[in-house]
Design a protein with these regions (language model features):
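Acidic, metal/ion-coordinating pockets
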Residues: 1-251
Length: 251
């Protein structure tokens, strides 16, 4: 995509974008930095990528009509599950995107919870070309453990963590995670932790809208302007909503 195409985003009124996706390092660090700089020059805020994990997890904060809105972005499309290297998630001394796990979602939400009136989480995740969220890893017991933070995804390969709400996880390692995160469960978890709206992209086609505990989850809005030669990818949606101090309404 040519850098000058950012003018289309400006013309379309785009104010905030997520850079947490599996293509952010397609042309390595120089292209990621160029992308960030072009967006900065165009006045478009972004989150979800960085030269290290600290930068990648930083939120975008917007104050709109007296409401402070935090935009959090992350992805689980690291390449670890197929051993596609180099992995795409950022690390302590490695560029990439913010890695999406229950542990890090909780940390992201906690980092803005004290001052943000509304929290939007953008997730680049899910099954491509699937019309409904979910995966082969869903099970009733696993979903319940997931919601209670009793089981880390890494426990699927023998690594277990059982943190309480306030404790530090000394033996936690992202290297042991796998992105089998039970699509609906991790989105429910984000709402339970304090998110007001969850928007998901990556499947390339429209998936369902779900209201969970009074909060909306858009499981996939389609491609918007990402053209593919598959008829099922042609439809797309724009999500409209009003917001006040109580949250997002009138979807």
């Amino acid at each position: 995509c040519a850098p000058e195409n950012v003018s289309g985003l400006v013309y379309g009124g785009i104010d905030v974008v997520s850079l947490a996706n599996n293509h952010i390092l397609d042309y390595m660090e120089p292209a990621m930095i160029q992308t960030q700089n072009i967006l900065n020059e165009a006045g478009i805020a972004h989150s979800g990528s960085g030269m290290n994990s600290y930068e990648a997890y930083l939120p975008t904060i917007k104050s709109i009509k007296g409401q402070v809105i935090a935009f959090l972005a992350s992805s689980d499309r690291t390449g670890q599950y197929n051993n596609y290297q180099p992995y795409l998630n950022a690390g302590e001394n490695k560029s990439g995107f913010a890695y999406m796990t229950p542990y890090y979602i909780r940390q992201q939400i906690n980092s803005v919870g004290s001052f943000a009136d509304l929290i939007i989480i953008e997730m680049h995740a899910g099954s491509e070309y699937s019309h409904a969220p979910g995966s082969d890893y869903d099970s009733i017991s696993r979903l319940e453990d997931f919601r209670n933070m009793k089981t880390n995804p890494a426990s699927l390969i023998g690594f277990q963590m059982t943190p309480d709400q306030e404790s530090e996880i000394d033996d936690y390692s992202w290297r042991l995670d796998r992105p089998k995160l039970w699509d609906r469960a991790i989105r429910h978890f984000a709402i339970d932790e304090g998110a007001d709206l969850v928007v998901v992209h990556h499947p390339h086609i429209i998936q369902g809208l779900e209201v969970y505990n009074g909060k909306l989850i858009a499981h996939s809005l389609g491609n918007f302007i990402f053209d593919l030669n598959y008829p099922e990818t042609y439809p797309s949606m724009i999500l409209n909503s009003k917001a006040d101090e109580s949250g997002f309404t009138e979807f």
